């Protein structure tokens, strides 16, 4: 069977309901925490390390929920939401590969913020480069990622780690 290499907003919503990879497997968060509108490219080859890559997008409009509260009179998308989107994509990648379990962000190395997403922006683009996947008692992916707004890179993260757990009882 051929793997799908792009996903629409409806596909991502199906993933948030646990319908894309099957019950008990990788899920994206539901809106409002779903920080992705579409995955325009996903592959298990290519990228900076030759081990897989994802490119995803979020459409920006001034009515997005976080602009009203972060910050009043100085609206900006919280940087942690961009970081979370990168973790969301690494977890999605593991599910897309057919690995079982529920995703959990496990940390990252260095994270840098050198720009911002304002309500006047049009589009955020996420680029994820898979460095390594480990499939033992825990399925784990390690990746680097960047966030760009309207074509300008504004965040970077190294060593993003996401694991899939068949049981989270002891987590």
Swiss-Prot record:
Note the Pfam families from the entry.
Answer: FabA
**Annotated pathway:** Lipid metabolism; fatty acid biosynthesis
Catalyses which reaction(s):
a (3R)-hydroxyacyl-[ACP] = a (2E)-enoyl-[ACP] + H2O; (3R)-hydroxydecanoyl-[ACP] = (2E)-decenoyl-[ACP] + H2O; (2E)-decenoyl-[ACP] = (3Z)-decenoyl-[ACP]
Xref: CDD domains: FabA
Q: Which UniProt keywords apply?
A: Cytoplasm, Fatty acid biosynthesis, Fatty acid metabolism, Isomerase, Lipid biosynthesis, Lipid metabolism, Lyase
Any idea which GO molecular function terms this record carries? (3R)-hydroxyacyl-[acyl-carrier-protein] dehydratase activity; trans-2-decenoyl-acyl-carrier-protein isomerase activity
Q: Which GO terms describe its cellular component?
A: cytoplasm
Question: What main location does UniProt list?
Answer: cytoplasm
Active site: which residues?
A: 70
- Which cysteine pairs make disulfide bonds? none
Which compartments is it annotated to reside in? Cytoplasm
Q: Name one GO biological process term.
A: unsaturated fatty acid biosynthetic process
Q: What is its EC number?
A: 4.2.1.59, 5.3.3.14
Query: What is the protein's quaternary organization?
Result: Homodimer.
Q: Which family does it belong to?
A: Belongs to the thioester dehydratase family. FabA subfamily.
Described purpose of this protein according to its UniProt entry: Necessary for the introduction of cis unsaturation into fatty acids. Catalyzes the dehydration of (3R)-3-hydroxydecanoyl-ACP to E-(2)-decenoyl-ACP and then its isomerization to Z-(3)-decenoyl-ACP. Can catalyze the dehydratase reaction for beta-hydroxyacyl-ACPs with saturated chain lengths up to 16:0, being most active on intermediate chain length.
Mind telling me what this protein is named?
3-hydroxydecanoyl-[acyl-carrier-protein] dehydratase
Give the species this sequence originates from: Pseudomonas aeruginosa (strain ATCC 15692 / DSM 22644 / CIP 104116 / JCM 14847 / LMG 12228 / 1C / PRS 101 / PAO1)
């Amino acid at each position: 069977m051929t793997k799908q290499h792009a996903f629409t907003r409806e596909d991502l919503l199906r993933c948030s309901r646990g319908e894309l990879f099957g019950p008990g497997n990788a899920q994206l968060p539901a809106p409002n925490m779903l920080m992705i509108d579409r995955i325009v490219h996903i592959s298990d080859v290519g990228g900076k390390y030759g081990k897989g890559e994802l490119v995803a997008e979020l459409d920006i409009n001034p009515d997005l929920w976080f602009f009203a509260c972060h910050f009043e009179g100085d609206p900006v998308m919280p940087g942690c939401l961009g970081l979370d989107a990168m973790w969301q994509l690494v977890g999605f990648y593991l599910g897309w590969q057919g690995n079982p379990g529920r995703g959990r962000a496990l940390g990252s190395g260095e994270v840098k913020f050198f720009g911002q997403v304002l309500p006047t922006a049009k589009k955020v683009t996420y680029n994820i480069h898979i460095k390594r996947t480990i499939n033992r008692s825990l399925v784990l992916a390690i990746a680097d990622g960047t966030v760009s707004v309207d074509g300008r890179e504004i965040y970077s993260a190294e060593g993003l780690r996401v694991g899939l757990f068949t049981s989270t009882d002891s987590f």
